[in-house]
Structures are given as structure tokens and as C-alpha cells.
């Protein structure tokens, strides 16, 4: 089971001021209440760095079942990938990602081979 979204955000605060990601914090608060993605399986392949964890916290707060994909076609911080594993968020190599997922959040076509039930988002 993934770590609570609250814990993920708390671990960001020593590195980033809340003023640096106000939209994601607002989204986090709104989605924590409404849970619009409850049970939705999402895979996300975008550059993975510590600040990306704010997006992951919002998706988890919304009820998403999140998997993060890393790929050589885009940069990622290996320490952050390890941290995600410690949070209980599955991290997979994009080229080995299966599916289907409800929503595929892709970047640079890293997940173009992964089937989606509802659609794709190119970031």
C-alpha cells in the first residue's frame, strides 16, 4: 500500500516552499475531499525528480492507483525513484510496462505501447 499523500507532501516541505507549488497543493486539497480518481489505475512517465512528488501526492489523494515509469528517453533522478519505492509507489521501466491502465500519462512516447481503457495524456 502506498504511503499517505500527506507523508509525501511533508517530506517535500524541507526542500520546497508551499509558495513554489500552490496549484498542486490546491488540487491536492480539493481531490482529497472529492476523490475523483478513486480506483483509477494510472501510469505516469514524465521526468522524475523530487518536485514531481507533489504531482504524485495529488494523484494519490484523488484515489488513483499510481505506477511511475522511468525511461532512458527522459531524465530522472535515481534517488527519487528509490524514494518512490519506499513510499510503496511501484516504479517500472517504461519499455517493460504492461497494462492496461485506465489512463496513461506519457512523455516522449515512452508508454505508447501501453494499452489504455480511457485515454492517453501527452505531457
What residue ranges belong to the model's regions?
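N-terminal ligand-binding/catalytic initiation module
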Residues: 1-123
Amino acid at each position: 500500500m502506498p504511503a499517505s499523500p500527506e507523508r509525501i507532501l511533508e517530506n517535500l516541505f524541507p526542500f520546497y516552499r508551499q509558495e513554489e507549488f500552490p496549484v498542486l497543493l490546491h488540487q491536492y486539497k480539493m481531490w482529497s475531499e472529492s476523490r475523483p480518481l478513486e480506483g483509477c489505475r494510472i501510469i505516469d512517465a514524465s521526468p522524475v525528480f523530487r518536485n514531481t512528488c507533489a504531482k504524485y501526492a495529488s494523484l494519490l489523494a484523488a484515489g488513483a492507483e499510481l505506477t511511475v515509469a522511468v525511461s532512458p528517453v527522459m531524465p530522472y533522478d535515481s534517488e527519487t525513484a528509490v524514494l518512490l519505492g519506499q513510499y510503496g509507489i511501484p516504479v517500472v521501466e517504461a519499455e517493460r510496462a504492461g497494462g492496461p491502465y485506465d489512463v496513461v500519462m506519457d512523455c516522449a512516447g515512452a508508454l505508447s505501447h501501453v494499452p489504455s481503457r480511457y485515454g492517453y495524456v501527452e505531457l
